[in-house]
Each structure stands twice: as structure tokens, then as C-alpha cells.
């Protein structure tokens, strides 16, 4: 069970209630979050976001989005490990759609970190499919989402965050049947 929060007090309450993973969309910007994650020894997903939720889509800019995003994530993860956190309990999320425009998102989807940390992609129903495919309604973005999920599996992405679990299970089962080497 994962708690999706940027606030260490909320994460602590969720961990007390039985959650075993913190998914922090701010990349551990709350100084107390790092200490909490280390003290509890829980799994953590560190996500990249340029800016804050209220302003993150206002002209996001990068010199090299892939390098900047993954260097930031790896630096944060390495800091946790240097303070005693188990690297196997850390996954990195490049934050598709969080402080990135369509070009940035596509560049990130065409690249992958060469770190030893697990990689998570959360692309389910994202607004990029509105731009890419003209799908206004989120419920009409499944085909695009599944296309990226197939690409993710072929690229070796470790974890997908999805809404349509059954459709993704069918896709990944079919792809693993056709490409057994991907099932390892």
C-alpha cells in the first residue's frame, strides 16, 4: 500500500496505518520526508517535478530534460542510500506530465536511466494524449496509455502506475507471451 503525498506528516500517519511505501511527487523536498523514509525503512518512489503543482506547467524549460531529470533523481536516491536506506527500496519516476511539455515527455519516454534503481512510469490517461491524439476526455486515452505501456515493457521499465488494471494485465500478458525474454 502506497501513500501519494508531499507531506511528511501525512506519510507518517499513512505508514502508521499500514502503508509500506511513500510516493512523493515532490522528490523529497519536505526535509522531514527524507528522515521519515530512512527511519521507517519503507519503500519510496522519488518523482521529478519542476516547480509546484500550481505552476509546474507554466513554460517548463530544460537544457537537457533527460540528463537533468535523472541526475536529480539519482542524486536524491544516492543521498538516501548514503544515509543507510536500502537501494532496493527506492524507485525513480521521471514525472511524465509534471513540469514538462509534450516534447519533454516524449524525450523522457525515449530514454531511460542507466542507474541501478528501479524505474516507474506513470503515464495513465495523461494530458499528453490529449495533445498527441486529440483525446479530450481522460477515459478516451486508454489506447495511447497502452501503447506507452507496451513501449515501457520493451524498454525494461520496472513499474507502471495505471488506472485500467485489467487492460494493462491483458496487454502485458500478451506481450510477454509473444516475447518471453521480457517476462524475466
Please report, for each region that a protein language model flagged, where it lies by residue:
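Active-site-adjacent loop and "lid" segments of alpha/beta metabolic enzymes
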Residues: 5-9, 15-16, 20-79, 98-184
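Conserved C-terminal portion of the radical SAM core fold
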Residues: 81-83
